[in-house]
Structures are given as C-alpha cells and as structure tokens.
From Swiss-Prot:
<dbReference type="InterPro" id="IPR020084">
    <property type="entry name" value="NUDIX_hydrolase_CS"/>
</dbReference>
<dbReference type="InterPro" id="IPR000086">
    <property type="entry name" value="NUDIX_hydrolase_dom"/>
</dbReference>
<dbReference type="GO" id="GO:0034353">
    <property type="term" value="F:mRNA 5'-diphosphatase activity"/>
</dbReference>
<comment type="similarity">
    <text>Belongs to the Nudix hydrolase family. RppH subfamily.</text>
</comment>
<feature type="short sequence motif" description="Nudix box">
    <location>
        <begin position="38"/>
        <end position="59"/>
    </location>
</feature>
<dbReference type="InterPro" id="IPR015797">
    <property type="entry name" value="NUDIX_hydrolase-like_dom_sf"/>
</dbReference>
<dbReference type="InterPro" id="IPR022927">
    <property type="entry name" value="RppH"/>
</dbReference>
<keyword id="KW-0378">Hydrolase</keyword>
<protein>
    <recommendedName>
        <fullName>RNA pyrophosphohydrolase</fullName>
        <ecNumber>3.6.1.-</ecNumber>
    </recommendedName>
</protein>
<comment type="function">
    <text>Accelerates the degradation of transcripts by removing pyrophosphate from the 5'-end of triphosphorylated RNA, leading to a more labile monophosphorylated state that can stimulate subsequent ribonuclease cleavage.</text>
</comment>
<dbReference type="InterPro" id="IPR020476">
    <property type="entry name" value="Nudix_hydrolase"/>
</dbReference>
<feature type="domain" description="Nudix hydrolase">
    <location>
        <begin position="6"/>
        <end position="149"/>
    </location>
</feature>
<dbReference type="GO" id="GO:0005737">
    <property type="term" value="C:cytoplasm"/>
</dbReference>
<dbReference type="GO" id="GO:0006402">
    <property type="term" value="P:mRNA catabolic process"/>
</dbReference>
<dbReference type="Pfam" id="PF00293">
    <property type="entry name" value="NUDIX"/>
</dbReference>
Length: 159
C-alpha cells in the first residue's frame, strides 16, 4: 500500500525498559542498527500493524508491552535514490510512519528475533534513549529525532 505521493505507510517501534533505555536492533548479517519498524497492510490500523510487527520482528505479544504514546501525525523520510526500486509500480520513494513508544511489561527473555522464517534482526541491546540519533543511517535520522523528541515527555522511568 503506497500513497499517492509515493510513501509507504509504516509503524516505528520504540520499546523501553524500566530504566528508560530503548531496544536497539541489529539488522541481520549487517552492522546496521535501528528501531523495529514495518509496513501497514491494507485494512490494518497502525495499532494492529504495531502488534503484528512487534511479534514478527522481536517476538513480543500485546500482553508483553504497554503503549505509552504515539506520534500525532505521520513522519516521513525519503529513501536514497540507490534504494528506490525504479522498476516497481507503484513507485515507493520513502516511508511515512506513525511511531509508538512502548514499555516492556513482560519478561526481557521473551524478546526473540528468530520466530519467523525470514528474521530482520539477529541481535539487540538496550541503549540510552537518545543514543540512536547518532547511530541510525543518515536518511532516517531526522524522523528518529522528531519521534524521540515528541515522545520523550511520555517516557516512564521507574526507580
């Protein structure tokens, strides 16, 4: 599902622990790290896509997390030209994302990257809330900055 401007609807997932760290996932067979994210299917709400992607990418179920906040609008990024599939129709030039801030309420050992036949990640770690800004690929950096900034006031840290 690609909108009339060429952007694919997508959800981004910022999963936090009790001390305010975020889950940072390593793309399979790469030294590239990012937050879990994934496309929204036809007739699927952003929240439904969130739970599906959460399960597919990190093995967690709805009962393992609590939604703390969601970005108000869509945040967009353009793909670098080298990643645009120019022979695909409709043409996708980037992603438009709704970002969700979640708190892990289930056990940490429930995080699993190997539950699907084609896993997207092969490792993960907890990092400080703002750490991803200096690490994510350049073309996603502004969306990460906007999402983290908007959602930061809703971050819950337990003593």
């Amino acid at each position: 599902m690609i909108d009339s401007d060429g952007f694919r609807p997508n959800v981004g997932i910022i999963l936090t622990n009790d001390v305010g760290q975020v889950l940072w996932a390593r793309r399979i067979n790469q030294d590239a790290w990012q937050f879990p994210q994934g496309g929204i299917n036809d007739r699927e709400s952003p929240e439904e896509a969130l739970y599906r992607e959460l399960n597919e990418e990190v093995g967690l179920e709805e009962q393992d997390v609590k939604i703390l906040a969601c970005t108000r609008g869509w945040l967009r990024y353009r793909l670098p030209q080298r990643l645009v599939r120019t022979h695909s129709q409709p043409l996708c030039i980037g992603q438009k994302q709704k970002w969700f801030l979640l708190r892990l309420t289930g056990a940490e050992d429930r995080v699993r990257m190997d539950l699907t036949g084609k896993p997207e990640f092969d490792g993960w770690r907890w990092v400080s809330y703002w750490y991803p800004l200096g690490q994510v690929v350049t073309f996603k950096r502004e969306v990460y900055r906007r999402a983290l900034k908007e959602l930061a006031p809703r971050l819950i840290v337990r003593d």
